[in-house]
Amino acid sequence: AEIAYRKSYDTALKKYPEKARLIKENLDRLSDLEKAENTNIDEISNTFGNLMAEVFSYKDDEYAQSLKNVGFNIGKYIYILDAFADLDDDIKNKSYNPFISYKDDREALKMRVDKLISMILSRLEMNILSLDLNLNRTIIENILYSGVYLRYKGILIGVEDKKNM
């Protein structure tokens, strides 16, 4: 598997050297922010969003900016929701988590995450609607409205239920 991965990586690196550079730059920045135990969730999630923006906009065409915006918002969504869902384990394992300052105020954290994710999903919806997706629009809307939204709400409720046990 590693050989196949390496070959794919080398091919992508040759085909998209600027993308590879930008992705690596954002990965390095993310690593630095996490090592510094940065708790500014906007700065950290924006960095992961920038990384995902590069992944989503692989070619320069009329959809590049919209796809960058989709990737950026998906990246922010993933980073924030993952940090929220992992907080208990990160506290227990003494691992980095940007939400560590909320360890004693879960209700405030839940409200903050709910607000952040709601704004991100609103922007994501606008970005997706700006794309010409006639063929797969229904599938993409189902993923966005059912999958992504319900996953986020489930994690918020699940964390609350876990806390109340």
Predicted regions span which residues?
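Acidic catalytic motifs of isoprenoid enzymes
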Residues: 1-48, 54-69, 76, 80-118, ...
